[in-house]
């Protein structure tokens, strides 16, 4: 089967957002009296914001009442940081042009919310090339579960076996 579709992750691959997620999480957790070390933060890199917040709230016995508020605040702070100091990763426009000129179907599959995916597409200047986007935000399982990639492939009317996927994060063992 010939490859005819390419699906990209977003955070850390298209935009340098990981440090911004770290900053936003640090600011929000500080409100709850928690300071995460770099090692602690990196041990949960790749989790969806909801899972990240739930994990650390459990670890620090912060209770369940504030989960949704903390998650919302982190997302709002990341969006503001992306707008003011977000950076597009080197080579993004080149690689999108490469696949676009070869008539590949192109999609983005991310754990981030759709609003952030839309902002990243705008920042990268790739709106005309992206034909589908999928978020794992409301899926039963986040990455590394492949559902978000399968959903994106379905949106592109692509056979998953004909897809080339670019992903930079793997959860630790």
Residue ranges of each PLM-predicted region?
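Metal-dependent phosphoesterase signature
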Residues: 57-94, 102-104
């Amino acid at each position: 089967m010939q490859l005819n579709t390419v699906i990209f992750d977003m955070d850390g691959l298209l935009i340098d957002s990981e440090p911004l997620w770290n900053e936003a999480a640090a600011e929000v957790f500080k409100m709850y009296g928690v300071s995460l070390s770099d090692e602690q933060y990196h041990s949960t890199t790749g989790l969806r914001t909801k899972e990240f917040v739930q994990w650390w709230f459990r670890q620090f016995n912060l209770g369940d009442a504030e989960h949704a508020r903390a998650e919302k605040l982190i997302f709002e702070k990341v969006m503001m940081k992306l707008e003011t100091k977000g950076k597009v990763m080197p080579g993004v426009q080149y690689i999108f042009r490469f696949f676009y000129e070869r008539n590949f179907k192109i999609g983005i599959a991310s754990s981030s919310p759709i609003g952030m995916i839309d902002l990243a597409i705008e920042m990268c200047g790739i709106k005309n090339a992206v034909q589908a986007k999928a978020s794992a935000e409301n899926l039963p399982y986040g990455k590394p579960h492949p559902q978000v990639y399968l959903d994106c492939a379905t949106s592109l009317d692509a056979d998953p076996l004909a897809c080339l996927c670019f992903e930079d994060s793997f959860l630790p063992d």
